[in-house]
Amino acid sequence: MAVHNFDVVVIGSGPAGESAAINAAKHGKRVAIVEKQQAVGGNCTHWGTIPSKALRHQVKQIMQFNTNRMFRDIGEPRWFSFPRVLERSKVTIDQQVEMRTQFYSRNRINLFFGVARFRDEHTLTVRDNQDGVEELCAQQFVIATGSRPYRPADINFRHPRIYCSDTILGLSHTPRTLIIFGAGVIGSEYASIFSGLGVKVDLIDMRERLLSFLDDEISDALSYHLRQNGVLVRHNEDYESIEGDESGVIVKLKSGKRLRADAFLWANGRTGNTDELGLENIGLEPNGRGQLQVDEHYRTMVPHIYAVGDVIGWPSLASAAYDQGRSASDDFLDEDFRFVEDIPTGIYTIPEISSVGKNERELTEAKVPYEVAQAFFKDTARAQITGDTVGMLKILFHRETLEILGIHCFGDQASEILHIGQAIMQQKGEANTLKYFINTTFNYPTMAEAYRVAAQNGLNRVF
């Protein structure tokens, strides 16, 4: 058995693992990265963020073609099958894998493909798909193994019509009807995608409202547009049983309702990928969802073993995972450490949603004297030109100091638009002010000028 010695070994090549490994390598450390799959990128690249967002982009283009009056003048609406749309999305995955493989090569990071398992606190074995075993020894370890869809034992995921958010990307036909259980971020995004392809979707929500962590006005806007696209949202529901047959799937709800569809997608919760790591050999125990507990420096109970990304739970975002990986490596490199917080949320429904900071409910409960600044996309020249007039920018600010407290955006390019306000919101002291948008000249016509419109709207409310 070959034995290799490194300064740092990172388990997992998703956003968290990639940033931890590259940061350590750029500081002169000998770094190895272990990836279970036969290509780098992790769940984010192969089954999660990248394919689903690429798929969403293709569906959005189809929707624009079918609703744009200019295109209707030259032809009838076009119908595309799910597999055909998905095929184009796979091009992006290949590009991502090639690019990230070059990152590791350029930074002289050693890649090992196989299942990683701790032998002791400083030793890791890697078993490849040919049952070959290699041993990696290191002073520091970073666990960045990500997560996978939570699969309840009473649901038969081997049935050809029952899917989770990973296997749905292997769907070989276009269902006429689809039941999605779980109305969180993933469930809402797929409800938008499939309804955009003309599929009738039942979205089952175990809570009272969609994405309750969002500002109420934004959540209500999402509910409205899902309904407009033919999505039936069922709140406060749970399943009694889910059974598939040759022609479809029958879902019995605890409320007594019975639903039937061509296919079923489970999108309710995720589990950390820790079951194959041999954590018992190093004295670590994950929680019931396979997640590891860490301190404010991303250290586990074993001080030289760090954990970052989805494997530690909230917020389970690729953007946060990337920053966590870099911050963890900064800690053992004795560089400036930053705990990752104030994380923006990007939800890629159609239209998309993005937010950062406090929402109205939180500010009201805290008795903060805030005011609302709004700009509607339909009132901006750029949106009128592109035709993407659905949406709004909402800024919450302190009515006395004009400090920006929260930013919420709904509509096309929301996740891009948000970062302008986020940059000002992160400034210290008086630099964080709504007046910045009044005193700044924006390009015209742009969506960015929505900040100026919103700021003027908000200041008109202050007396």
UniProtKB/Swiss-Prot annotation:
Domain of life: Bacteria
Record-linked NCBIfam families: PRK05249.1 (NF003585)
UniProt enzyme class: oxidoreductase
Location within or outside the cell: Cytoplasm
One example GO MF annotation: flavin adenine dinucleotide binding
Record protein name field: Soluble pyridine nucleotide transhydrogenase
Family: Belongs to the class-I pyridine nucleotide-disulfide oxidoreductase family.
Cofactor mode of binding and number, as noted: Binds 1 FAD per subunit.
